[in-house]
């Protein structure tokens, strides 16, 4: 089932398409939409092991290269932020990036810190990243330019999924894809970055993406959004967990994911 669902999602990777082309998009405006599928910490050769993706590339797809090196170094959070900024960008440390779904208390915290209205997903500590980029960035990039441009043009964005891990019984949140989708104030109109995983002791850190839920939410989100960012998460967790595995168990887990 996991391979089937990933294959389904992978066929839409960074594709601009007419909504009416797909069965779940009936009765929706024919304006083009984008589904951005993030498979972090993997390679093109691994991606091409997915039959449906390979066939899409052979028949009508293209491969592009993008320099996503961040300001002051190359790591996941700077790379995601640089994609969203349209140039090399700097952000706060990992522990100071805090994307959370909207709630009454979280909205109060966000609005008190930023003076801006909260949206569906908000970076509660966005000012740390803004200040880090302003004070130490060398390229003049503006965080959240992509999301802001979407918002300014009346286009709605959504983020689904995360790369969270569990270590020593503690949840360590990783929602860095939101750095690509957010507006200049660290906001994303809607999505689900909290309840998209399931317990799976056979997978890295004892959790995995709930693909059944992800595919349902992707279909539903597609109806009312123009750009959907989907974080698969499992490829990141596998790469991070690799030192805990031997060659055989690593390959077995990779096969389950891909």
What are these regions (language model features)?
Residues 13-18:
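Hydrophobic core
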Residues 19-27:
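Sec-dependent signal peptide cleavage junction
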Residues 26-32, 42-227, 233-240:
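Active-site-proximal alpha/beta segments of enzymes that process anionic O-linked groups
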Residues 237-244, 248-250:
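Intrinsically disordered, low-complexity regions in plant nuclear regulators
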Residues 252-258:
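Metal-dependent active-site segment of extracytoplasmic phospho-/sulfohydrolases and closely related
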